[in-house]
Amino acid sequence: MTVVVCLFPVYWMISTAFKPSKDIQSADPQLFPHTWTLTHFQRAVDADGFALFWRNSILVTLGAVLLALLVALGAAFAVARMRWKGRRQFMLMVFIAQMAPWESLIIPVYIISRDTDMLDRLPTLTLIYFMITLPFTIVVLRGFIGTIPPELEEAAQVDGCTRTGAFWRVAMPLLAPGLMATSLFGFITAWNEFAYANFLIIKQQDNRTLPVWLSSFQNTFGTDWGATMAASTLFALPALVIFLLLQRHVTSGFAAGAVKG
């Protein structure tokens, strides 16, 4: 029953995207479309800025995910494999940052962006999404590295590898599930984020991302529900496809990352 309740809005979105406008506005809602149409998808694809905003979202999302993986991998390795003063305090700050409601920082972030002339710029969104996803990525990768026996890297060092070389040649292949799990989390977080994108992109409307673009189907004359649902369906496809492709790795990655996280 819980699954049905959770999935019904998704089903309703997809089914509405294929219904003719007269059926959408009917006083007698239909659970299953009796007549199928692709008109709403055509209208969504033909909307102003469709390709441009897809490009913006892809650039911002991939940039944030790759940057978070790079920084988090170094931080997780340092915490899991090295002993240094302040290590526990560092992880405490990471946990606090992970639990922090990032929406509460939107005003300070806006002021900083305004004063540094970073408003209306895609790199600003990339950095913000990077900071939002970084704590979680560090926690999961740290737990995952902790499950890899250090003896494997030590054996590689005995064979002539440097410490860094041993990590890249031995540990990195074993980290694949953890990297995929955190990548998926970062992708979904950055791909779906609306508040910062809507608040920080003010004048340069060509720098908007897809979540903000979806609101363009609402105007003073009402909402084009067919096109909105079609655009929302297209918007949800990348995250859904990536999740289905990586589902097995994601499950094992989160499970392993939670062991010593």
List where the protein language model places each region:
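A structural signal for multi-pass alpha-helical bundles of membrane permease subunits
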Residues: 1-261
